[in-house]
Regions:
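Residue-level detector of Asp-centered blade-edge/turn motifs that repeat once per structural unit
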Residues: 57, 64-67, 108-111
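Cap/lid segment of the alpha/beta-hydrolase catalytic domain
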Residues: 145-276, 282, 309, 316-324
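Multi-bladed beta-propeller domains
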Residues: 6, 17-22, 26-59, 75, ...
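Active-site-proximal cap/loop segments of hydrolase catalytic domains
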Residues: 236-439
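Conserved beta-strand position repeated once per blade in WD40 beta-propeller domains
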Residues: 61, 104-106, 126
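A flexible loop/linker signature enriched in serine peptidases of the S9 family
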Residues: 4-15, 45-56, 73-83, 118-126, ...
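Hydrophobic beta-strand positions that form the internal "hydrophobic ladder"
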Residues: 1-2, 70-71, 114
Length: 439
């Protein structure tokens, strides 16, 4: 049995050998005993991740070739690649495939070929087949995710960012990471003496991560003159167990501080206008948006997609799969009830002074619409400018292409209203409300 495990603090690949017979490890008489940690043999110990969070069915970060080698995902320094591991020698070879992300993490092999979904920073994602030993031109892109033509002249490619952070605004006793996509449009020219607005994008999970890849959402902003900084806050995966577990008991604190410090870093380094800083995210990322606006004054606007406003209500109402997730991220109830209250943005909505856009799926069972409704009530009571867009048939994460386009148009119109500019092109008819509920 082969599996990824992290006794050293990194998800490395291990081989588990089961003893024959006996029941010491749970096997029945006459059956092979189940392998235990004591049977584990590291194929290669290294400060890199060979595993990912098992959020969905079908996840497989490695596959066996006919000659015994293992094609495996390896995330080093936050950047994933597909490599070849010799389980007998521990040799790990990087063939230099031109892919920067592999999502979903589903590596498959028939012994001769390796199949995966590969993402690049300059081309759409694709289903890829690769013969490691064949001299036939390299990986074959069997099917791309879109048939639309892509003009590379408009593509903004990311730059890796490492910035100081910690348990306070402006602290520098910890480190977080991200990918910065600069504004890029060959048909437009920005003022030479002005830094661009910045959109900090916050991934969900929270134990997920942002990876460098071509994203139509990111390019939507960069072609319109907005820089995008996708943050990998403490708690993100791909940086080892210590970084991942830094969010245990600290959700709503350290992730938010890392986003705040990321924006401050961008402004201090001169690649973001300190007076035009926005933050956007969905699910756990939406929670970070609400908390960043409620507890900090760094951002000038925020867009929360199906974000968590009330932690205690989430613990009571979310779906079964994540029903105990908050025990580790925040603390067990009822013992940690005060912590839930202290970190819930809806309980501190008086701190939200920047304009806020809420986008919500009407059929969401993970973060139910009641979360957005409670936040609206608090914003109305405090006369905070906001806008609300509901998608009645959407669930957790918008799937319909027209709805995704509507959400982008609404967010663009929202920033136009918040930052007092007229967006180019087609935008949504959106009005900021103050002291009143949406019709």
């Amino acid at each position: 049995l082969h599996a990824a495990a992290d006794p050293t603090g990194w998800w490395n690949l291990y081989r588990f050998r089961a003893d024959s017979g006996g029941d010491a490890a749970g096997g029945r008489d006459g059956d092979a005993a189940l392998p235990t940690a004591g049977d584990a043999e590291a194929l290669r110990e290294t400060s890199a991740a060979f595993g990912v969070p098992m959020w969905t069915l079908g996840v497989s970060t490695f596959a066996f070739l006919g000659d015994g080698r293992i094609a495996t995902l390896v995330t080093e320094g936050g950047d994933p690649s597909l490599r070849l591991l010799d389980p007998e020698t521990g040799d790990l070879v990087d063939p230099g495939l031109p892919y920067s992300s592999f999502r979903p993490a589903s590596i498959r092999s028939d012994g001769d070929r390796v199949a995966f979904v590969g993402h690049r920073t300059d081309a759409p994602s694709a289903v890829v087949a690769w013969r490691p030993e064949a001299d036939d031109g390299g990986p074959r892109r069997l099917r791309e995710s879109t048939d639309d033509a892509l003009d590379p002249a408009y593509v903004s490619e990311p730059e890796s960012v490492t910035f100081p952070t910690g348990d306070a605004v402006g602290a520098d006793d910890a480190t977080a990471y991200g990918h910065y996509y600069p504004p890029h449009n060959p048909d437009a020219e920005a003022p030479a003496d002005a830094a661009p607005p910045l959109l900090v994008r916050v991934h969900g999970g929270p134990t997920s991560r942002s990876e460098a890849s071509l994203s139509s959402t990111v390019q939507f902003w960069t072609t319109r003159g907005v820089g995008v900084l996708a943050v990998n806050y403490r708690g993100s995966t791909g940086y080892g167990r210590a970084f991942r577990e830094a969010l245990k008991g600290e959700w709503g604190v350290r992730d938010v501080l890392d986003c705040v410090n990321a924006a401050r870093y961008a402004a201090d380094e001169g690649f973001a206008d300190p007076d035009r800083l926005a933050i956007s995210g969905g699910s756990a990322g939406g929670f970070a948006v609400l908390a960043a606006l409620a507890f900090h004054d760094t951002f000038d606007a925020g867009a929360s997609y199906y974000g968590v406003a009330d932690l205690r209500a989430l613990a009571a109402e979310t779906h079964k799969f994540e029903s105990r997730y908050l025990d580790g991220l925040v603390g067990p109830l009822p013992e940690a009830a005060d912590v839930y209250e202290a970190r819930s943005p809806v309980a501190h909505a008086e701190g939200v002074t920047a304009p806020l856009l809420l986008l919500q799926g009407g059929e969401d069972e993970v973060v139910p619409p009641a979360q957005a409704e409670a936040m609206i009530d608090a914003l109305v009571a405090n006369e905070t400018p906001y806008a609300y867009v509901e998608f009645p048939e959407e669930r957790h994460g918008f799937r319909d292409a027209d709805n995704v386009a509507r959400a982008h148009a609404a967010e663009l119109a929202f920033y136009g209203a918040a930052f007092d500019f007229d967006p180019a092109g087609s935008v949504a008819d959106l009005e900021l409300l103050v002291g009143e509920r949406p019709e």
